[in-house]
């Protein structure tokens, strides 16, 4: 029985996970062109030319830095623009980690600091308003 329930729950989670659409991913940056070194005949990278503007950079990191500074927004569009920074937090005089829960009476709008104090206030002042005078007499008369 437990195995059956486990399988049902697993299938439920799998179906929910498949139903969640994934956001579109931005396009990948262009690949770093690999140019062989003509002097040593090795495959070591010597220079990289930008396919957008033709600028030649000496290394892959320099090419990627050039790409991000100059052409990223052209390729990625609005996805490349950074979101505006969050406003700085407003300083407060006092930071409370715990605020006590108060209980307000819906009949007289008196606020009691705790649940037992509210129940005591309710029984003393408003029980007759809700149930009428007969509520207390019936409670005493019943065995």
Curated annotation (Swiss-Prot):
Q: Where are the zinc fingers (C2H2-type)?
A: 48-71, 103-126
| Any one GO CC term of the record | extracellular region
Q: What induces it?
A: Expressed during multiple stages of host plant infection, including the early biotrophy, late biotrophy and transition.
- Which molecular-function annotation in GO is an example for this chain? zinc ion binding
| Signal peptide extent | 1-19
Q: What does this protein do?
A: Probable secreted effector that translocates into the nuclei of host cells to reprogram the expression of targeted genes by binding on effector binding elements in rice.
- The molecule here is called Host transcription reprogramming factor 8
Q: What organism, scientifically named, is this protein from? A: Pyricularia oryzae (strain 70-15 / ATCC MYA-4617 / FGSC 8958)
Gene name? HTR8
């Amino acid at each position: 029985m437990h195995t059956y329930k486990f399988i049902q729950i697993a299938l439920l989670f799998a179906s929910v996970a498949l139903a969640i659409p994934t956001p579109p991913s931005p396009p990948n940056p262009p690949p770093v062109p690999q140019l062989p070194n003509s002097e040593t005949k090795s495959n070591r990278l010597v220079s990289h030319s930008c396919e957008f503007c033709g600028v030649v950079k000496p290394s892959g990191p320099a090419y990627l830095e050039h790409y991000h500074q100059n052409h990223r927004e052209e390729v990625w569009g609005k996805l490349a623009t950074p979101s505006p920074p969050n406003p700085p937090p407003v300083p407060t005089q006092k930071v409370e980690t715990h605020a006590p829960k108060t209980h307000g009476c819906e009949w007289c709008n008196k606020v009691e600091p705790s649940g037992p104090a509210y129940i005591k206030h309710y029984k003393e002042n408003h029980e007759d308003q809700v149930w009428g005078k007969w509520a207390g007499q019936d409670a005493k008369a019943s065995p």
